[in-house]
């Protein structure tokens, strides 16, 4: 039987925990059985020791066990991609990954985006979508209805992971990034087959990549070398390339992990994109960011479009399954498809269908209550 003194003591002794023990800790937290001091002590000790993929895997397993169920048909789920990143880079850019989600859906790839309201910025993905007219607090049936009608859906973390409310206070009071900061992109309740994940914390980016590789997810994990949790348009980015493929049951039972993801450097200038100053991507409140989003969908050129195209191209590469080719070549090949989704009006049409479908689903849910 695990205990908090045992787990925190082991971490302070710089001993890594197996997934069963971190799953126990997360189960206690999700059940409301852990005190704020225990939650904070565990998170800080884990960070000080350095998180491993197995430890993160245990946290994810317990968090999923407490989540509201969402069952997306396999033929859709397997093709779908999530563009959710970790946030926390303190750059206060506009909602690049959310805009990229609309572009990817406009290119014909199903998108199941996991997200929440703002934590470290003025406008989170949920804030932006609500401002654009999307009903965000939908039950599972509403999420699936949006996916079928518009090719895109939003899983609001507060709806599907209500037990995470126990983490909010200690996390805010600690004030430094911990493992809790990376769980959002790794706990999408729909479990899409592909992900494009920006990670702000340089320590945790390779850990996130290995977790996704062990899961068999097709993915690109990236971090701008300027600290942005995006493919930055200002300088180089580091990308971890994960082709995906289901791990074998025998391998999982033996505790084997997938091969380490391939690490590459990406320079946006190699695909014809360069933004000299990140300041031109600064966002503000939800009305401002919504106006920027609508301008993008209307075809407005400029640094926001260029940066969103990079993000959308990365998501398209992840959805298709990264190959052995250099990642720069793969992103370059996907850029025209992303641009066409905007210029043809397809991405804007996705937003129109999504707002209609989500509002209808919200009305149906209200009647059912």
From Swiss-Prot:
Binds 2 magnesium ions per monomer. It is an enzyme of class 2 (transferase). It catalyses: N-(5-phospho-beta-D-ribosyl)anthranilate + diphosphate = 5-phospho-alpha-D-ribose 1-diphosphate + anthranilate. Pathway: Amino-acid biosynthesis; L-tryptophan biosynthesis; L-tryptophan from chorismate: step 2/5. Anthranilate 1 binds at residues 85, 116. Its EC number is 2.4.2.18. Anthranilate 2 binds at residue 171. Keywords: Amino-acid biosynthesis, Aromatic amino acid biosynthesis, Glycosyltransferase, Magnesium, Metal-binding, Transferase, Tryptophan biosynthesis. The keyword DNA-binding does not apply. 5-phospho-alpha-D-ribose 1-diphosphate binds at residues 85, 88-89, 93, 95-98, 113-121, 125. Pfam families: Glycos_trans_3N (PF02885), Glycos_transf_3 (PF00591). Mg(2+) 2 binds at residues 229-230. InterPro entries: Anthranilate_Pribosyl_Tfrase, Glycosyl_Trfase_fam3, Glycosyl_Trfase_fam3_N_dom, Glycosyl_Trfase_fam3_N_dom_sf, Nuc_phospho_transferase. One of its GO terms (molecular function) is anthranilate phosphoribosyltransferase activity. It comes from the Bacteria. Coiled coil: none annotated. One of its GO terms (biological process) is L-tryptophan biosynthetic process. Belongs to the anthranilate phosphoribosyltransferase family. Homodimer. PANTHER family: ANTHRANILATE PHOSPHORIBOSYLTRANSFERASE. This is Anthranilate phosphoribosyltransferase. The gene is trpD.
